[in-house]
Amino acid sequence: MDVKSAFLNGDLEEEVYIEQPDGFILGNDPNLVCRLKKALYGLKQAPRAWYYRLDKYLHQQGFSKGSADSNLYIKIENDKLLILVVYVDDIIFGSNEESMSQSFALVMQKEFEMSLLGELTYFLGLQIQQNEGGIFLSQTKYLKQILKKYGMEDAKPVCTPMVTGCSLNANDESAAVHQPTYISMIGSLLYLTGTRLDIMHAVGKVGRFQANPKETHLQALKRIFK
């Protein structure tokens, strides 16, 4: 589900004042200012105010917050379980009981203006496929995007992320390469490890040389993309 104008739901704890809007003069005195009661987009307090507002409401509905992830909420009723994850104004949720999911959607729509987007198929670069066999995650679309970003969409595929017996060291004497690009490539692959556990070791190995990457390190890094 997607919360519309989410930040406008936040209640401000601080005193914040704004100039009177153009065309609106209170009491014919242009020197008066308005005190905000609700957050506005562009206000530095807005994201936090929205999070506190949503967090308070979810606790009122019987949810408890995950200990490892502050954006994860869990609600248990007898043998029924409802789990939801919040990412700013996007909320994904699921339950082992369909009626519990439906009830949650209804109470949320009464409290906030939002739209239901149907069965989850894509979220933060993750493609989600659900069927009777289970729930399957992939990042094919994301992988194509990063291959294009680094000009490697036509690279010849290889069978393994690293050459057998690959030895890399910080004292490599090959030419230095563009550090920001190298770091960016490492970051892109780190996000990919969410579904590609087979490249984690290789990414960790080339990630050791981000402070001073050399051509040899870059070639090893590019191999992982292939």
Regions found by a protein language model. Name each.
Residues M1-K226:
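Long, low-complexity, charge-biased intrinsically disordered regions
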